[in-house]
Amino acid sequence: MTDKNDRAGVPASGARARRSPSRQPLARSAERARADAIFLGRLRRHHDELRWLYMELYDNADMFGELVDQLRRFYDERPAALRALDERRERAGAWYRERGQLGMQMYIDNFAGTIAGVEGRLDYLERCGVTYVHLMPFLDTPTDRSRSDGGYAVSDFRRVKPGLGTMEDLARLAERCHERGISLCMDFVMNHTSDEHEWARRARAGEGEYMSRYFFESRQDVIDRYTRDVPQVFPTTAPGHFTYLPELGQHVMTQFYPYQWDLNYRNPRVFNEMMYNFLFLANQGIDVMRLDAVPYIWKQLGTNCRNLPQVHTIVRMMRMISEVVCPGVVLLGEVVMAPVEVVPYFGTVEKPECHMLYNVTTMATTWSTVACRDTRLLRSQLEAVCALPRAYTFLNYLRCHDDIGWGLDYATLSGWGMEEVPHKRYLNDYFQGLVPGSTSRGELYNADPVTGDARFCATTASMCGVEAAALAGDGAAMDVALRKDVMLHAYLLAQSGLPIIYSGDELAQVNDYSYRDDPERADDSRYVHRGRFDWSLVGRADDPGSAQGRIFGALEELEGIRRDEAVFDADASVEIVNYSDPAILWIRRSAGGRTLEAVFNFSDDEKNLWMPARARFTDLVSGDEGEFETFSLPAWDFRWYLRA
């Protein structure tokens, strides 16, 4: 017979206690004490500043107290494996800055059907050398795809979209990824919700508590002031800033699409609840949170509602909250703004905000350089990046899920005789293949017939000419297109920061025009580069004579060199050489007494180039060694020369 105290873990007799001592309660107690000490130490480090900023913004001590209580709850609920990972990353420092990091961005359904399907494809991702996977939006959205904005109209922040899987699937995928040294990134859409979100449905029903979480307005003069002062996000496809709701007789703010209601971060309940969503997702094993449209989150009448000081207050609080509960998690800011407006989102070295930012301007400037065969603006952009503190880390990319907006430095370009409107028109014509000599293919997005402004959509391979060469059956043109594609990836890998490849680019996948046959997608040309991953191409990756084999093999080799060579360290010294020929981009990286001369030819002509001095160099790609002062560089080619 078992004593009731024994069932509770209390020995029934001294003899039994001596025979079978229970150490588990003591172990649990010690583990709990250690966890308490870790949490309280982190909270003490940030509490005063966090409270100061919160009270400055909201002046609500009760809501701040609730927030702190919830931080403890989410910390307690954080799985032990993730807590251990947090501690390892705290000891290691900025893990995302390691030179061996390589990202890949993908849509779950296009790549593998479901989250479980992605788990089944991890061997392929490892083969690609991927250490960071950005899963495009997978949270629940309206079933009508024309109202989902590709996943950016979230209906439920704690539910995976049916058909893709479950939160349990996500947590399991994160666990399997961590076993392989792969981190997971997701989009945290914090500016707005879908109009089908519970908050929006209750607001539409007239519940004041939920109406206060959005911006409702009935005064036409106020709406007119917003229209006057705030730039439109989609002036042609979704003009205006408000959507009228006849059942309420009011307008609700919708800066993006009418079905995406802007959240009111003036309400502390909105901030708190969104932070709880953030921490819930972090506790599923997400390593990197991409803060979508973060510059837009604070609205103030009489301003342009972009990049306001309160935005930085919120991001700084998010950084501290994550460092208390889940310090292994990285904040990645999506700031599609002019360079002068991007850098402040790093915060300061003493009071950091985002860990990483998208290098949007450099991406757009790179493609402008391809079209113009002139690297001067790109040099200027890279020099500005090099002048920043080395702790500031950019996520570098050639293409992503989104369109390319030509947000270039037109103040500089106009000084060189390139005016904004005709230059943008030239770029869009060039990449559509409408300019003589262009082999690019793609489509315009959100074209404005009045101003002539538009954004551009295509895959990397199609922009480099792979699609056009394949359709023409032109082997010589294909050689040039593939050389250009490889050169651009070599340039990507030569930059400091975390390089990320869009899924399919490693196999030179071209545009997919089938979206035109889908009524729910036909009006959104961004789907031209959001096609399904073509698994039939993977079999050609081992064929060095195929386009896929040439790209895959080249990227595999370049990524391996980057992993092994210390000159690619994030803390290496980087200089942009002002070479006399504007078609040449020259990046010099130095570390540990070794120097890399990374040289790129953005032109259709072979170039004869001069080193700074005669010396002995090793070509890191071919392995050739020799002493020389001059060298030739074919059109759209590159060299990685190492000098010891």
Locations of regions flagged by a protein language model:
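Active-site and adjacent substrate-binding regions of carbohydrate-active enzymes
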Residues: T2-A644
